[in-house]
C-alpha cells in the first residue's frame, strides 16, 4: 500500500506551463516542464515558467522528468530549470529528445542525463514503473505515461486525440490503453483544452483539402506557422510535392527543425525543393515564416511593416495564417491580420477554422471508457475547460465526487488506494523570463508598464565637489512623457522645484543625497500628476564635479 500525492506546479487554470508531480512514497516523478507564452501586456517578458522551488528542495527524491511531446508548453522550461536540478534524468521519446537537445544546445547547456525511451518499454524504479504509450498529437512520437503502483495505475495523457487514419509516429495504441484499463487505473489525468468542443476532433484537424485549393492559385503564397505545427506542415508539404512549387523557410528555428525532421525520417519532403532566401520573390514560391518561441509573429510583423530587406508583400500574394492564437497573443495576431488586409493580400485565416490535435469531448469520453479510472483529474486548460472536462466525464459515467478539479498547488492525496480528504497545498508561483536577463519579477514588469504608459523623466543634478552647492542649472529630459516644446512652462517649473529640494537639503560643505533623491522624485511626481495627469518614471543622475 502506498501514499500517493498528485499536484500541479503549473498547467491548471491556464494554457501552457504544464508541470505535474506524482509523489509515491517520497519517490517523485515529474511529468512535463513547459512554458506559457507571455501576453501582450507583459512588456519585455519572453515567456513564463512555473516556479520550481519545490523541485530544487526535493531534487534528491526526483526519479526523473518525463516529457510527453516536443511542444514548448510541455518542454520549454527545461533550459531554465535543468542547470539547478543537476543530475535529475530527463526521459523522452526519440523525436522529442532530438528537440530537447536542440533547445539545450541553443541555450549553451550541456546536460548528460538525457535518456531516450521507447513506447511500450517499461522503465523500472523498484516497485514503481513508468510505461510510455503512443498517443495521437500534432507532433510525432507523442506519448502518455502510465505510472504503475501497488494501488493501481496513474495515467497522464499528455495532449491527445483519436484519429484512426493516423499512422506511424502519430498513431494511438488503443489496444494498450484498453489493456491498462483492464489492469486497473486509480487516477486518470486528462487534458482539457478542447473539452468544451462537441464531438471528436477528427477530421476537423486536417487542413489538406483547403491547402490543395490554395496551392492551385497563381502567384506567391506566404504561410505563417509555428515551428511545432509538425502535422500541418507535413500536410502542406504533401500538397507541395504534387506541384512545381518550391519552398523558402524564414526563421532559423523552423528551418533547423524541418531539416532535422526530414533527416530523421519524421517528415517527408524533397529537400531539393527547399530554396535559399534569394528565391523569396519567385512567382511559384511558398514562403514559410515562423519565429523563435520568445517573440511570436515578430518576423511576420516586421515584414508587414516594411522593415524586412528580403521580402515585401504585395496585392498578388496569398497569405495563409496557420499559427494558433494562444491566450494573451490576440492583440499581436490581430495586428498581423489587419496589416495583411491593409496591403490588399488574399488573406486566408485557418487559426480558428481548423482544430489542433487536442481532445474534444468525445475523445475525452472514449479515453475514460478505455481506461475506466476510479478517479479523474482534468488538467492542461483554463478552469472553464476543466469544468467542461468534468461534464464530459459525468456523461461518460464517472461519479461526480470522483472527479477532481483542482488549481495549481492543490494536492490530491491517496492513501492505500483511497482518496484522503486532506487540505494539503504546495506553494506555487510563476517566473517571468526575459531571454537576456532571466527572471524578470513583478517589480521590473511594473516599471516597464510605467515606462510604456507614462514615459520617463531624467533629472541631471551637478554638484560642486568642494562647496556641495549646485554647479550648473538642473537639467530635465523626458521621453514618452510630454512634448517639451509645448510644455516649456511645465518643465521650467519642474527645474525650480528640483532646485528648491536640492537647496533645502544643502548646508555648507554638506549635502544629504538621500533626501535630495527622495525629495526630487516625490515633489516632481506630485507636480507632474497635478499638471499633466500622469506620473512618469523619474530617474536621477547626481554627479559631483
Which sequence ranges carry the predicted segments?
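His/Asp/Glu-rich metal-coordinating catalytic cores
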Residues: 1-66, 71-279, 299-308, 331
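Hard-cation-handling environments
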Residues: 196-322, 326-372, 377-489, 497-510, ...
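C-terminal tails and terminal domains of large nucleic-acid-associated
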Residues: 509-517, 521-545
Amino acid at each position: 500500500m502506498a501514499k500517493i500525492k498528485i499536484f500541479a506546479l503549473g498547467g491548471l487554470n491556464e494554457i501552457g506551463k504544464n508541470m505535474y508531480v506524482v509523489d509515491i512514497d517520497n519517490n517523485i516523478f515529474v511529468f512535463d516542464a513547459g512554458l506559457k507564452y507571455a501576453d501582450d501586456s507583459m512588456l519585455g517578458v519572453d515567456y513564463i515558467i512555473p516556479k520550481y522551488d519545490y523541485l530544487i528542495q526535493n531534487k534528491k527524491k526526483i526519479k526523473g522528468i518525463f516529457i510527453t511531446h516536443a511542444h514548448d508548453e510541455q518542454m520549454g522550461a527545461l533550459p531554465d530549470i535543468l542547470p539547478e536540478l543537476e543530475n535529475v534524468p530527463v526521459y523522452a521519446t526519440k523525436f522529442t529528445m532530438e528537440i530537447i537537445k536542440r533547445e539545450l544546445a541553443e541555450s549553451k547547456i550541456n546536460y548528460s542525463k538525457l535518456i531516450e525511451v521507447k513506447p511500450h518499454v517499461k522503465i523500472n524504479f523498484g516497485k514503481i514503473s513508468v510505461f510510455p504509450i503512443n498517443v495521437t498529437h500534432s507532433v510525432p512520437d507523442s506519448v502518455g505515461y502510465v505510472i504503475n503502483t501497488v494501488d493501481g495505475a496513474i495515467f497522464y495523457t499528455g495532449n491527445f486525440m483519436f484519429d484512426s487514419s493516423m499512422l506511424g509516429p502519430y498513431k494511438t495504441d488503443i489496444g494498450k490503453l484498453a489493456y491498462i484499463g483492464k489492469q486497473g487505473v486509480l487516477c486518470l489525468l486528462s487534458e482539457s483544452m478542447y473539452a468544451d468542443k462537441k464531438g471528436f476532433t477528427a477530421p476537423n484537424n486536417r487542413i489538406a483539402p483547403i491547402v490543395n485549393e490554395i496551392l492551385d492559385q497563381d502567384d506567391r503564397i506566404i504561410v505563417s506557422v509555428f515551428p511545432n505545427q509538425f502535422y500541418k506542415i507535413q500536410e502542406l508539404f504533401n500538397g507541395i510535392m504534387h506541384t512545381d512549387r518550391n519552398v523558402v523557410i524564414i526563421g532559423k528555428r523552423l528551418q533547423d527543425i524541418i531539416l532535422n525532421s526530414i533527416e530523421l525520417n519524421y517528415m517527408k519532403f524533397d529537400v531539393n525543393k527547399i530554396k535559399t532566401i534569394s528565391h523569396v520573390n519567385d512567382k511559384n514560391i511558398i514562403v514559410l515564416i515562423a519565429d523563435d518561441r520568445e517573440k511570436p509573429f515578430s518576423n511576420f510583423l516586421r515584414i508587414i511593416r516594411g522593415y524586412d530587406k528580403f521580402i515585401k508583400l504585395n496585392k498578388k500574394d496569398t497569405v495563409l495564417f496557420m499559427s494558433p492564437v494562444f491566450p494573451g497573443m490576440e492583440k499581436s495576431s490581430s495586428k498581423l491580420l489587419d496589416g495583411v488586409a491593409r496591403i490588399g493580400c488574399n488573406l486566408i485565416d485557418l487559426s480558428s477554422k481548423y482544430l489542433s490535435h487536442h481532445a474534444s469531448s468525445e475523445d475525452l469520453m472514449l479515453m475514460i471508457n478505455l481506461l475506466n479510472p476510479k478517479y479523474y483529474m482534468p488538467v492542461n486548460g483554463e478552469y472553464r475547460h476543466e469544468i467542461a472536462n468534468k461534464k464530459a466525464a459525468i456523461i461518460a459515467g464517472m461519479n461526480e465526487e470522483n472527479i477532481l478539479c483542482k488549481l495549481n498547488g492543490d494536492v490530491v492525496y491517496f492513501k492505500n488506494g483511497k482518496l484522503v480528504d486532506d487540505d494539503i497545498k504546495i506553494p506555487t508561483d510563476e517566473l517571468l523570463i526575459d531571454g537576456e536577463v532571466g527572471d524578470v519579477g513583478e517589480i521590473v514588469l511594473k516599471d516597464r508598464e510605467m515606462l510604456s504608459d507614462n514615459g520617463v523623466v531624467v533629472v541631471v543634478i551637478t554638484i560642486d565637489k568642494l562647496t556641495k552647492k549646485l554647479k550648473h542649472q538642473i537639467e530635465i529630459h523626458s521621453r514618452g512623457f510630454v512634448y517639451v516644446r509645448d510644455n516649456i512652462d511645465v518643465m521650467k517649473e519642474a527645474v525650480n522645484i528640483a532646485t528648491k529640494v536640492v537647496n533645502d537639503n544643502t548646508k555648507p560643505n554638506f549635502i544629504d543625497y538621500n533626501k535630495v533623491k527622495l525629495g526630487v522624485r516625490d515633489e516632481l511626481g506630485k507636480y507632474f500628476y497635478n499638471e499633466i495627469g500622469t506620473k512618469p518614471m523619474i530617474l536621477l543622475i547626481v554627479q559631483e564635479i
